[in-house]
């Protein structure tokens, strides 16, 4: 198997996950900024790998498999770290909700693909808005330089949680006939 640049970017994102986790735990004042910057770098590769794969017509089965896995693991790890830092139900609840949604929708997409109806649960615009709010929340909450930035991050986390539910229900509604078919 020959790896192309988009796939290398996805692999780079996977490799970055333990580095931003490690940076989170470093006992230095600059550690939160370092953690957030590594997360941003990894998140940018998420946009870039897909863009390049489509632009250069280099989509592969391996890339199509690995990209969403890398995204989900990266976001789940960041949510776990944020929940651990704040150590409160009002952060853990939206974080856990988002992780649960990712698992549910990933399973739904896999199942819909098995029955030949993957396009019924393709990524929607609301899913893209949710991802944007989620990334804003995670970057600010991993960085958290002051109460204002943390407040913006918490607000974005709740916006992302609401959009998480909205998009999940959209996907489930789109698949309802297949899910509840006799």
UniProtKB/Swiss-Prot annotation:
Location relative to the cell: Cell inner membrane
UniProt signal peptide: none
Coiled-coil segments on the chain, per record: none
TM stretches of this protein: 13-37, 61-81, 87-107, 146-168
Cellular component GO terms, alphabetical: plasma membrane
Recorded topology in the membrane: Multi-pass membrane protein
GO BP annotations listed: phosphatidylglycerol biosynthetic process
General function of this protein: Catalyzes the conversion of cytidine diphosphate diacylglycerol (CDP-DG) and glycerol 3-phosphate into phosphatidylglycerol. Essential for the synthesis of anionic phospholipids, thereby playing a role in balancing the ratio of zwitterionic and anionic phospholipids, which is thought to be important for normal membrane function.
Listed name of the protein: CDP-diacylglycerol--glycerol-3-phosphate 3-phosphatidyltransferase
Organism: Sodalis glossinidius (strain morsitans)
């Amino acid at each position: 198997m020959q790896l192309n640049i988009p796939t290398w970017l996805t692999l780079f994102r996977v490799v970055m996950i333990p580095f931003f986790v490690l940076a989170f735990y470093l006992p230095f004042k600059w550690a939160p900024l370092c953690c957030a910057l590594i997360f941003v770098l990894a998140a940018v590769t998420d946009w870039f790998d897909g863009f390049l794969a489509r632009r250069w017509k280099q989509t592969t089965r391996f890339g199509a498999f690995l990209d969403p896995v890398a995204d989900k693991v990266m976001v789940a790890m960041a949510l776990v770290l944020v929940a651990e830092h704040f150590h409160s139900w009002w952060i853990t609840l939206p974080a856990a909700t988002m992780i649960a949604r990712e698992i549910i929708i990933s399973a739904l997409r896999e199942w819909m693909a098995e029955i030949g109806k993957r396009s019924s649960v393709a990524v929607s615009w609301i899913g893209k808005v949710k991802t944007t709010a989620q990334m804003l929340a995670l970057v600010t909450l991993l960085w958290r330089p002051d109460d204002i930035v943390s407040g913006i991050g918490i607000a974005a986390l709740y916006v992302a949680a609401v959009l998480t539910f909205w998009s999940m229900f959209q996907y489930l509604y789109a698949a309802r006939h297949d899910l509840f078919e006799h």
